[in-house]
């Protein structure tokens, strides 16, 4: 399963392809074999740190408990 980048506004607000945004508490699963991407329950995956500084936010304390 592959997840897309998370948005800056929240670690678990993850973008599906085509600018579909999964709401808080959901993550995006990329569809395979022509299937559409789906938002499912689960923590978002942060984007890899190969972009610019400032693309990342600290994960809020409440998510770490």
Curated annotation (Swiss-Prot):
The annotated consequence of residue 20 to A reads:
Decreased affinity for thrombin
User: Where in the sequence is Sulfotyrosine found?
Assistant: 63
Task: Name the consequence of residue 21 to A.
Answer: Slightly decreased affinity for thrombin
Give the consequence of mutating residue 3 to A: Strongly decreased affinity for thrombin
Q: Which Pfam families match?
A: Hirudin
Instruction: Print the keywords alphabetically.
Output: Blood coagulation cascade inhibiting toxin, Disulfide bond, Glycoprotein, Hemostasis impairing toxin, Pharmaceutical, Protease inhibitor, Secreted, Serine protease inhibitor, Sulfation, Toxin
InterPro entries per UniProt: Hirudin, Hirudin/antistatin, Prot_inh_hirudin
The effect annotated for residue 63 to A/E/L is: Slightly decreased affinity for thrombin
Q: What is this protein called?
A: Hirudin variant-1
């Amino acid at each position: 399963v592959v997840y897309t980048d998370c948005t800056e506004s929240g670690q678990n607000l993850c973008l599906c392809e085509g600018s579909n945004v999964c709401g808080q508490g959901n993550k995006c699963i990329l569809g395979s074999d022509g299937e559409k991407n789906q938002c499912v329950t689960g923590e978002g995956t942060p984007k890899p740190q190969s972009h610019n500084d400032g693309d990342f936010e600290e994960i809020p304390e409440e998510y770490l408990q």
